[in-house]
Amino acid sequence: MTNPIVTIEMEDGGETQIELYAETAPNTVRNFVSLVSKGFYNGTTFHRVIPGFMIQGGDPEGNGMGGPGYTIAGEFAMNGFHNDLKHTRGVLSMARAMDPNSAGSQFFIMVEDAPHLDNQYAAFGRVITGMDVCDRIVATRTNFRDMPLKPQVMKSVTVETFGESFDEPEKV
């Protein structure tokens, strides 16, 4: 199986490509592919950026509170699922609330290593090109809630599945 490749095209023309690891977190990848295929992320922003840590996006409301209207089970060790992908620079992972089964659509991309997140969040991909775009996003000026003063808009988010089909995710 060839891993799917997601392309995030920013409103300013920057582009990042991310390889998704279906063998590492299969339901998480199905969820992400499903949302991308439906155009869910088009026009959303990276609403939370923290230098030395990560950039977070995927909230349709743009304030950190939104999602797709459902959640999925967290595919990580603390939740009883083997996932050995470490939260190193460039890794893609699902954001969630305190509940380990609360991930929906919000995701984050690591701009620095964060081993304290390992086994507690569902890592499921890695940036393969365009890490410079992530670095530019994380360097933008923010308010006291880590929200960029100038919105960092994902103009278009697409996925290439190389002919592989992905079922809808299992929802909690």
Please tell me what each predicted stretch does.
Residues 1-172:
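Cyclophilin-like peptidyl-prolyl cis-trans isomerases
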